[in-house]
Amino acid sequence: MSIGLSIVSCKKDSFLSEHWNHPLSTQRNPEVQLTQIESNLDPKQCANCHENQFKAWQSSFHAKSIGNGILWQKEILSFEEWNRCLHCHSPLPETKAEISETFQTHEILDSKRKHFPSGISNPSIQCASCHIRNQIWYGPPSRNLTANQLTTLQANLPHNGFKVQEEFESSAFCQSCHESPESGQKLNGKHLMEVYQEWENTSFAKKGIQCQNCHMPNRDHTWKGIHDPDFVRAGLQPSWSLTRTANGEIQIDAKLKSIGIGHKFPTYLIPKVYLRFFGKNQFGNRKLIEESILGRLVNTNLTEEYYDTRITPGNSHNVSFRFTLDEKAIKTLDWEIEVDPDEHYIRSFEESLREKGNLLSAETKKQLQLSLSEKKDSRYVLFTLSLPVPVSLPK
């Protein structure tokens, strides 16, 4: 059973079609003359001029795309499945050669020795994964120089400067690894990943707001997302009210509105968001009264969708219910919103450990256990709101 998602898609743009034509070619290009320093593609080398981007990348999930969570799966996937995962998790053939025998050809190993002379300590998504093809550097338009000024300076820039591609500021650039292919598996009429399509049909797209505007503000290379509490909070607005009904019950009306998210929240089938309502006594002890779950719940075999309660951009998830109050016990009501960024992975990994644990090698089992622990630790409380119990008016 493959736990990873196959996410190589087709693209309309000719540059992007070539740029993300997997498997990528090696960096060998005899027509380009570079010094040894310039041809060294280690991210640490890029940091000599791009220190801020390097430091941001180090803390990003792109820099952790080859970790325990994917490495343990190599033992249970076919060669074809494993290599398909690497198209996005480790795009360069030189980095793939570190973790896949398929890419340990003479040509690729020769390119790896030349362009990574100190070796590859981290075969994840690197600077060159997005910015370099055949020893030609690509990037977005300069924010400080005109096209003519940049052309004049190119000859004096390291690695012959770079070719400007506006696609680096387009959502389509991200589509390759964040959208299922058109021919990909569907559940209940929806692909496993549709974040680009979700965005494409929104006011965000109509206004020209791209993925990069939110996930790479000021060209920041941390690519914040569902795992970052502050980032998520900025896109949501919770509101609620308590009223006492004529028969003495408490009516709760709660609304979580998507105010700054350009796709469904949460996107993909991996995260879940729990809206929980508690009654709290004078000692601070809480009792769960009601729970509502946001997300797309799919079985671990990726063959059946149970529900999809995600919020579309600009809309809300509403929860309304009544309950009978024990006035002596409950003084305050709490609304807590908890995010589990890796819920589907946790469920899948727990099942794999339970059913396959004894069949895995010791190293692979340890990788699975470590990844499972890491993903369980990713949960966080997004909001906690409290309201006093409405007073009972005298009759």
Q: Which residue stretches match the model-derived regions?
A:
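Outer-membrane beta-barrel translocator/pore domains, especially the C-terminal barrels
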Residues: E167-S170, W223-G225
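Short, conserved sequence motifs used for protein processing/export or organelle targeting and
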Residues: E200-K207, Q212-N213, P217-K395
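Bacterial N-terminal signal peptides
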Residues: M1-S6
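Sequence context of c-type cytochrome heme-c attachment sites
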Residues: C10-F168, S176, E182-F204
